[in-house]
Amino acid sequence: MSDSTTWLGDRYELLDIIGRGGMAEVWQARDHRLGRLVAVKRLRVDLASDSTFQARFQREAQSAAGLNHPNIVAVYDTGETTDPTTHMPVPYIVMELVEGHTLREVLRDGRKILPERALEFCVGVLNALAYSHAAGIVHRDIKPANVMLTRNGSIKVMDFGIARAVADTSATMTQTAAVIGTAQYLSPEQARGETVDNRADIYATGCLLYELLVGRPPFVGDSPVSVAYQHVREVPSPPSTLDPEVTPAMDAVTLKALAKDPEHRYPTATQMRLSLIHI
C-alpha cells in the first residue's frame, strides 16, 4: 500500500484492518501527534461516490462526537481524505481503540453466559443509552456486534452509525434496499417503517438480554422479512422456557422490554436499568 493510502491527514498511520461493516472499514492506526494507537473508521472507497452513504457516515460522526461516557466508545476526531484512485473524498472517524471482544464474538464462542453476567452486560448498555437519550440521540442499532466487552470486563457501546437526533426521526429511511438496523433486533415500529424514539433502543436491549440469557434471539427465521414479521406479530416465548436458570423476575424485565406497543415498554433506559439492578 502506498504512503498516500496509509496516512490520513499527515497524522494517522493506518496499520491493520480490524473490521469491515456494511458501509465502512475499521483500521488500527497510530496517531503520531499524540503517540497513541487509535481505531479509524473509514467509509468504503466504493461507497464514497454515493452521497447518501456519505451523508450517513457524516451523521454518524456528528452524533458520536458529542457523546462522552465510560460506556460509549469515544470519538476523537473526524476528517476527510482523497482516494488516490478515484479522487473522491473519503470521510473517516478516529475513535478510541478498545481491546476486547464484541458480545457477538462472546456468543459465538458457545460458552454459557451466566444470567448474572447477562444482566451486568445490559446494565452497561443501558447506562450508555440513558446518556445518549438525554442528549437526544437514539442509537437505533443495538445488537451484540455493536457492544464491546473490554479486557477489564466493562461494556462499551459503539457504532452510532444510524443514530439521529430525535428531531430527525421523521425522515424516511427507505433509500436503500436493506432495512437499516439488524432484523433480529429490530423494533416493531422500525419494522413497519414508523417514526421511532428511545423506546426502540429499549426493545433492542430486550432482544439483546434475551439472547444473552438463552443463547439465541427471541425471533429467528429464514429471511429478514420473516423475522421482521415476527417482531410485529408474534409473542416471544419467556426466556425461562429455554433455560431453567432464568428466573421469573428476569422473564418479566425481558418481556416488558419486548412489548409490541412502545407505551407498554420501559419508558426510559434508566428505569429498565433499575429493574435489572433490583433482580
Located regions from the model:
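Eukaryotic protein kinase
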Residues: 1-277
